[in-house]
């Protein structure tokens, strides 16, 4: 199984399947690259499909710090650098779409050829001005979403 290590020494899982122009598939919160298991065989006939497990998800390690969308975008940049991918198309589902937009905010659009956004909520967490976010989340700083928060969300779905 392929892993790469980020600059803060967290091992992140990724899979590369097929050949052709790079297509990156970014999963949503509490999911993994396995979310795309039915799409990967189809896409891999025309693309080199890169399907990472985001930090704290799937087969990737967590870190001591809380998850932030900014950190996930940095992890994506580091993975693209590691794989020597200069230009790619990207699909972001749910939180994965937020990661893409953060990537663009931080690094621009120069490396991105095409974008597909699937089922993205405008905001993940509840706040005073957004009542449609996830309930009962114990985030300590804006933009944080730690392991404890993940467990709270999952337990609220039972």
Question: Each predicted region: which residue ranges?
Answer:
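Glycine-rich phosphate-binding loop signature in dinucleotide/nucleotide-binding domains
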Residues: 18, 82-86, 109
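Conserved alpha/beta-hydrolase "nucleophile elbow" surrounding the catalytic nucleophile
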Residues: 27-29, 88, 92-97
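Short, hydrophobic alpha-helix immediately C-terminal to the catalytic nucleophile
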Residues: 37, 77, 101-102
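Residue in the alpha/beta-hydrolase core beta-strand immediately N-terminal to the catalytic nucleophile
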Residues: 53, 89, 113-116
């Amino acid at each position: 199984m392929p892993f790469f290590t980020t600059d803060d020494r967290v091992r992140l899982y990724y899979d590369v399947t097929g050949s052709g122009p790079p297509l990156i598939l970014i999963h949503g919160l509490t999911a993994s690259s396995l979310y795309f298991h039915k799409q990967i065989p189809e896409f891999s006939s025309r693309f080199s499909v890169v399907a990472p497990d985001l930090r704290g998800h799937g087969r990737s390690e967590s870190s001591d710090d809380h998850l932030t969308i900014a950190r996930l975008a940095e992890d994506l940049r580091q993975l693209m650098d590691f794989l020597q991918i200069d230009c790619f198309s990207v699909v972001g589902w749910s939180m994965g779409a937020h990661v893409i937009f953060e990537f663009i905010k931080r690094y621009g659009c120069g490396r991105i050829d095409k974008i597909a956004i699937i089922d993205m909520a405008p905001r993940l967490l509840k706040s005073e001005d957004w009542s449609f976010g996830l309930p009962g989340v114990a985030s300590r700083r804006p933009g944080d979403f730690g392991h404890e928060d993940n467990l709270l969300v999952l337990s609220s779905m039972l």
